[in-house]
Amino acid sequence: MSGRPRTTSFAESCKPVQQPSSFGSMKVSRDKDGSKVTTVVATPGQGPDRQQEVTYTDTKVIGNGSFGVVYQAKLCDTGELVAIKKVLQDKRFKNRELQIMRKLDHCNIVRLRYFFYSSGEKKDEVYLNLVLDYVPETVYRVARHYSRAKQALPIIYVKLYMYQLFRSLAYIHSFGICHRDIKPQNLLLDPETAVLKLCDFGSAKQLVRGEPNVSYICSRYYRAPELIFGATDYTSSIDVWSAGCVLAELLLGQPIFPGDSGVDQLVEIIKVLGTPTREQIREMNPNYTEFKFPQIKAHPWTKVFRARTPPEAIALCSRLLEYTPTSRLTPLDACAHSFFDELRDPNLKLPNGREFPALFNFTTQELSSNPSLSSILIPAHARNQAAVSTTSNTTSTSDSNTGERGSTNNAASASASNSS
C-alpha cells in the first residue's frame, strides 16, 4: 500500500548483542512420514530466560516483505500452529521488536511464544526468529471480502474489531509504547471466535518526551497529519488517528483518505476535515504555521458515510480523526464510547451463535490511564461474574507464573468489591 522503506526495529546498544551459547543449533530430521522436522533451542517469550528445545514441522512460507519472511509451522508437542517471523539481525544493535514483545501479555496482542537465532547463508549472517501465535485471518482480508461482494461489514463486527483494537492500544500505550503502523493488515482475526490480535511490532517504539522520532512512519493511508507535517515529537495519538482511519474504512468499505503520495494524503484529509486552523497546525508542527493552505470547508461527517451508518459510529470517528493530537480520544475513552454499548449487553451472542470473546477482563495496567472508566468498561454482569470467580479461586491467585495478566486481571473483581 505504501512504497516506504521498512523502518528499523533496532535499538542502539553500546556494545554488540551477545548471542546465546546455543546460537545456530538447529537440527533437521525426518519423521516416519518423511516430513521435515526442525528442532531448535529457543527462549520463552515471557518469563525467565530458560532455554528449551522446541520441535516443529509442516513449515511453509505465508508472507514476506522488506522485513524478512513469515512461516507457518506446527509444534510437534502440542500440534498447535504457530507463525515464525524471521528477520535479519544486526549484531550491533538490540532488536527493538523483540524487546517490546517480551514485555507484552494481552488477549488482543499476538503472543511471543519463543524466540531463537539462526545462521544465514552468508558468513556472519544472523537471523532472529520470533515464534508467534498463528491467527488465520486479517481485518484487511475480511473487509475486502465484503467489499468485493458489495456488502457492508455487519456493524456488530465493526464494533467487536474496533473495541478489541482500542483495548490493545490502551494496553501498549500504558507502557509508553507506540505501534506506529496500525492498519487492517496488522489486525489478525479468528473468524470463528471474532478474537482480534494486534501484530507486527517491527515499527513500534517506546516514545520518550523530548527525544525525536522519525516522521516517515506508518503506512500512508493511515498516517496522522502531524507525521505528514514532518513532526518528530509526536505522541502515541498517531495510533489513535490510524485506528480512526480503520474504523472509517470498515464503515465505508474503502479507505477514507486514499492519497497517492505524502502531499496528496494531506489533500485527501483536508477534503474531509477542511483546512486546519493556524492553531491546529501549531499543535501538529509549529514550523508550518506560516505555510499558506487553500481554504476549504469541512465536509459534514454525515455526508462522508452511508445513510444508514449509526450516528454513534460517526460521532466516534469524528473524535478520533482530529487535527489536534491532544483532542483525539484516548484508546480507553474510545472503549467507553456509546458506539460500543451493545457489546456490554449480557444477552448478545456472535452471529454464528458463539459467545462473545473476552471483552471485560481489563487489567489494572490497561485501566491505569483513567481508572474511573472501569464503571463503564466493566458492566455489572461482568463485575458479578468476576466476584464469583474470585471467591471460588482465592487459593490460586498467587501463581508465580501468571505475570502481568494474572496479577492484574483482577481489575473487574476489584471494581466489583468497590461497588458493593
Swiss-Prot record:
Keyword Methyltransferase: no
UniProt-listed Enzyme Commission number(s): 2.7.11.26
GO biological process, one term: negative regulation of DNA-templated transcription
GO MF assignments: ATP binding; beta-catenin binding; protein serine/threonine kinase activity; tau-protein kinase activity
Domain of life: Eukaryota
Annotated ATP binding sites: 62-70, 85
Disulfide bonds: none
Catalytic activity: L-seryl-[tau protein] + ATP = O-phospho-L-seryl-[tau protein] + ADP + H(+); L-threonyl-[tau protein] + ATP = O-phospho-L-threonyl-[tau protein] + ADP + H(+)
Protein kinase domain sequence ranges: 56-340
Matching InterPro entries: GSK-3, Kinase-like_dom_sf, Prot_kinase_dom, Protein_kinase_ATP_BS, Ser/Thr_kinase_AS, STKc_GSK3
Alphabetized Pfam families for the sequence: Pkinase
Disordered, as annotated region: 1-50, 384-420
Main subcellular localisation: cytoplasm
UniProt KW keywords: ATP-binding, Biological rhythms, Cell membrane, Cytoplasm, Developmental protein, Differentiation, Kinase, Membrane, Neurogenesis, Nucleotide-binding, Nucleus, Phosphoprotein, Serine/threonine-protein kinase, Transferase, Wnt signaling pathway
Catalytic site: 181
Subcellular location: Cytoplasm; Nucleus; Cell membrane
Function, in words: Plays a role in the organization of the formation of the main body axis of developing embryo. Acts as an inhibitor of differentiation of primary neurons. Inhibits the ability of ectopically expressed NEUROD1 and other bHLH factors to promote early retinal cell differentiation. May participate in the Wnt signaling pathway. May regulate the circadian clock via phosphorylation of the major clock components.
Similarity field: Belongs to the protein kinase superfamily. CMGC Ser/Thr protein kinase family. GSK-3 subfamily.
Protein name (database record): Glycogen synthase kinase-3 beta
